Amino acid sequence: MDILCGIEWDQFSDDKRAGYDYWIGSVHYLHGANTGKYYEIDFRKQDLAACIADDFGGDGLAAAEAYFRSVAEVAALGPDILGHIDLIKKLNRDGDFFDENAPRYRAAAMGALEAAHAAGCLLEVNTGGVFRGYRDDFYPSGWLLEAWAKMGGKVIITADAHSVDGLTYGYEEAARQVKAAGFASVQVLTGAGFETQEI
């Protein structure tokens, strides 16, 4: 078994990205220009609600657009893996904050996806939101995954496990969805680097 040392580096992390076997780039916070606050967008609904109300004029789609702009900025840094590209949807299962099918939402998400493609990022298919009961679908949403396949992008399946019992949760279903989206293979991280595995 290969044991590697990596870091999930957030846009607002103080940690350096160098010195690891790999790094995952991700966004977990939005910075409010009005209040100066940093809001964690994937932890508590009240935090996301306050972010939208106090710093985005009550416009949830504006918050989503800001999130995807931040993802594009992280993608431009060239992480080995771009993590949970649409994490902003985590607390939005019932559509309380924004419409995930709205043209503005989809355009913003596509902007982040195009930035990931331009930077040559490997896109994470992440099962963690389903495992922890927040979502019924993985990150990214199916339509984004299909768009990524059409771009010729590559994916890696991860569980984003915060506990041992979630280490390989949903891998078989994720592989089925990846294949249905148009991919013939996934990337697997080994001691020798990323390797292609057919599905």
Predicted regions and their residues:
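Extended substrate/RNA-proximal surfaces in nucleic-acid metabolism proteins
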Residues: M1-A118
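Charged catalytic cores and adjacent phosphate/nucleic-acid-binding surfaces used
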Residues: G95-I199
